[in-house]
Design a protein with these regions (language model features):
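Single-pass membrane-anchoring alpha-helices
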Residues: 1-27
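Parallel beta-helix/beta-solenoid repeats that form elongated, surface-exposed shafts/blades used
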Residues: 20-207
Length: 207
């Protein structure tokens, strides 16, 4: 009888010790910080698959496909890159901006994009660029396949302050353009495959 009691006691004690050990191990993995300084943070799955990178400009990787960088390139931004279940880049949030040796503002803006599976091109893009060479603020939707990337929808405004919605055909040619100029004049233009306006609607003057 005593032997059975000792066996049961030993089993219970072993179970409790194991539970406390596992709980202590799990608790040790959770740490709290008020502030962290880092050049780059990699987020990985338990099997090591890369899922997200938060990085400064110097450490931002090139395009990574299935865990391999092809090839390393210098991207003039800092930001956050997203990777799918296979460790292939499929979007990101990047930002930058500085003055070059001539005092011109270059690479200034922010871009949130998502890539189509199996293609290193963006099919959804929310961009804001404002530097010495370019100014664009808008939402861009594109078709992507083996033949390239073709813009289909643009909603935004340009450096002249014209707000517009552009609808393109499957070849990326603009076919419908809705615009409102800075002075408030609206218009709808219909274009042929060569980009020529074939019909246009504007405001009707009151009599």
């Amino acid at each position: 009888m005593l032997a059975k009691v000792l066996v049961v006691y030993s089993a219970v004690l072993t179970t409790l010790l194991a539970a406390f050990t596992l709980a202590g191990s799990a608790a040790a993995r959770v740490q709290h910080f008020d502030e962290i300084d880092a050049h780059r943070i990699n987020v990985r799955e338990p099997d090591g698959t890369l899922r997200m990178v938060i990085s400064n400009h110097a450490r931002l990787p090139g395009v990574i496909v299935r865990g391999k960088e092809h090839p390393p390139v210098d991207r003039p931004y800092a930001g956050m890159l997203f990777y799918n279940d296979e460790g292939t880049e499929n979007g990101g949030l990047v930002f930058g901006g500085h003055r070059n040796a001539n005092g011109e503002v270059v690479d200034s803006g922010v871009n949130l994009s998502f890539d189509r599976y199996g293609a290193s091109s963006q099919f959804v893009q929310l961009a804001g660029v404002d530097d010495s060479r370019n100014h664009i603020v808008g939402l861009i939707l594109s078709d992507t396949d083996a033949t390239g990337n073709r813009r289909r929808v643009f909603i935004g405004h340009d450096k002249e302050g014209v707000a517009s919605v552009s609808l393109m055909d499957c070849n990326g040619r603009k076919r419908i353009l809705l615009q409102v100029t800075p002075d408030g004049t609206p218009s709808i233009s219909f274009l042929d495959a060569d980009g020529k306006v074939v019909n246009q609607l504007g405001p009707t003057r009151s009599q």
